[in-house]
């Protein structure tokens, strides 16, 4: 059994939902980033989404855009991300998903990316801007291997399209809670039940909901209907606000514990 399936099964047995935490690798500095992520994992992150910084993150809002800029400015690249993954894997037992735009992967080479990601201990990848119809070059590298390809679904995805996207995915599905970019404000959780039910009619894959999640109350409401809750911009905003503070890792760990407590049914 792979780490992703094992994690969802273990949490379901405890009547918990997965806390999926996104952090841009190398923000605000490489060593600080490792310390922050390690503290967050120890505090309750179930699945880690490790962001590959990119110069043109069109799907992301200003908070994550700035985090990418800081990471790129200190020299973070794909090799840095692989090195960080390998370091985190020594202590973190949960799944590590690499979160990237396709351009860095294309420049690195799809086969090289898969080889080095797998060797570092990553469990899968989410490529934000790569639709199923254009994924063959990447997915052919690990055909038959237990390496997950996480897919995004939007609230506006037509029913007929949901099935095709889900069929090309593995691990879990990332269901976007609203249209717009990451970190958008005004999350309305009242429609989450209907969104999840619509997707569940097409797949048995776990569904994790993200975009605009910022409070423990948001987490608790989403966790009633989804298998996991994804938090990214709220973590990155807190990192940005805490730059220069000696206990930045502890600050992020405390917020992680608050979010994790809200995933318990």
From Swiss-Prot:
A GO CC term attached to the entry: cytosol
Annotated Pfam families: Trp_syntA
Active site residues of this protein: 49 (proton acceptor), 60 (proton acceptor)
CDD domains membership: Tryptophan_synthase_alpha
Residues annotated as transmembrane: none
Signal peptide span: none
InterPro entries linked to this entry: Aldolase_TIM (IPR013785), RibuloseP-bd_barrel (IPR011060), Trp_synthase_suA (IPR002028)
Keywords: Amino-acid biosynthesis, Aromatic amino acid biosynthesis, Lyase, Tryptophan biosynthesis
Gene Ontology molecular function: tryptophan synthase activity
Pathway(s) of this molecule: Amino-acid biosynthesis; L-tryptophan biosynthesis; L-tryptophan from chorismate: step 5/5
Function: The alpha subunit is responsible for the aldol cleavage of indoleglycerol phosphate to indole and glyceraldehyde 3-phosphate.
Stated name of the protein: Tryptophan synthase alpha chain
Origin species: Desulfosudis oleivorans (strain DSM 6200 / JCM 39069 / Hxd3) (Desulfococcus oleovorans)
